[in-house]
Every structure is written in structure tokens, then in C-alpha cells.
Amino acid sequence: MDSKKNLVLLGMMGSGKSTIGFLLAKKLNLRFFDTDFIIEKKVKMKISEIFEKKGEVEFRNLEKKVVLKFLNKPLCVISLGGGAFINEVIRKEAQKKCICIWLNWSSKTLIDRIKKNKKRPLVLNLNNN
């Protein structure tokens, strides 16, 4: 493992990126950055509110700016939002500069986790089914 590269946690919504990222950073004595949390603090809105009030395009533009900034931080663990890796610029930059770790779970596990969390912006209707 290249000890000079950041660790970036990727995965679908509900895969545990934030939880595992925090624990991994603590274990490795590194700083931890959750890009969704950083965006929420910056805009003073929850991710679901940003989607609702400003739309996904605006959110993805903001996400891109934040993620690219944090990919350049020295030696840290970064949790990306569930859809961040879809962006080609983010994906290429992360693959070039970081060690990317995909957290993979079954669809059933992800859906069960997401249904328990009312803050998930793209799947709020799952709770009604």
C-alpha cells in the first residue's frame, strides 16, 4: 500500500462509508472527512434539503468542488457521497491520487439500511412503500 495516498471510501447510499471511514481514520490515526457532512455545513442545509430546494444539478456542482478540494488534502480518509463517483472528473482524480475502496453490500441490505434513515434524498419514497 502506498502510505502517501489518501484512502477514499466509495459505495452506494447506506453502504457505511461515513461510519467505516470514521473508524478507519481513528485506527490509522488520520484525519477523516465526510464530504456530505462538509457540504451540509457549508450550505447550512441537509443534503435532502439541497436536493429539494436547489435540485440535483446544483448539488452535484457543489459536491464536485468540495470533493476535488478534499482529494488534495494530505494523508486522510475521505468518505464520498453515494453518487460522487459517477462524476468523471471526481472519479479520475480519486483514482489518480488516492486508494479507492468500494464498500459493497447486497441490494436488500442497502434498502433495509436506507429505509431506516429519513435523511436519504433520493429514496425518501421507499419509506412509503
Regions found by a protein language model. Give the residues of each.
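Phosphate-binding P-loop
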Residues: 1-4, 69-70
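P-loop (Walker A) phosphate-binding loop of NTP-binding proteins
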Residues: 12
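Hydrophobic anchor at the beta1->P-loop junction of P-loop NTPases
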Residues: 9
